[in-house]
């Protein structure tokens, strides 16, 4: 046995391998000579579903599809209308549409900006305006979405970023010294006050020692230069004195040789006379 729960009714218990009779129309629609348990009744019910609900499937025999004519279809349609099957189908469709609306409303509750849509839906239900719905191919009516253009116009426009002037950036490239100073500044900003003071005093001492060293080096250089100048002056003096002495000696030798030559010539003349 299978148990089926029905809405607003007690549970329905049916034997296994049998369909529930609650899904079929009333027994009066079948006319005389028909019963709910017969196979022909089930096939006729499937024929009705195929004709009016667009169901495509192999639930009825191919023989009836081939033998069925338009006149038979019209007769079956008239019988179904007379028995109230159409009213039952429309009632089911209204319930399904109501459930769809409830599901759609529950989804739109958490979506921002859905107040306009909900108010539009309520006004459509009250006024029953056919222009606010969109007809689909299966006969259903879907409410059109209403967009509030006034709120859209009040929204602020996005600000555009100013274009970057690459030429100026390329012209004003920082030197290596500036880059080092900027890096040092960023590093010192992350230090504490005590650490900054220690670094400051260290840099001051380093700069002072460097200045003193440069001054002492300059003084030593000047002293060395002075000594070299004095030594060069002495050498120049000595070289000039030696050169004078040499020149005087050469001149004296020349003079002595001249005197000797003259004296020798005078002696020879004197011998000739005697």
From Swiss-Prot:
Q: Does the keyword Cell cycle apply?
A: no
Q: Answer yes or no on keyword Transcription.
A: yes
Q: One biological process GO term for this chain?
A: circadian rhythm
Which residue ranges does the record annotate as region Disordered?
A: 209-249
Query: In what ranges is there compositional bias, type Basic and acidic residues?
Result: 223-235
Annotated keywords = Activator, Transcription, Transcription regulation
Q: What happens when the gene is disrupted?
A: No effect on circadian clock.
How would you summarize the oligomeric state and partners of this protein?
Interacts with REV8.
Domain of life assignment? Eukaryota
- InterPro entries reported for this sequence: LNK
Which stretches are tagged as biased composition: Polar residues? 236-249
Identify this protein by name: Protein LNK4
* Induction pattern: Repressed by members of the TOC1/PRR1 family of clock genes.
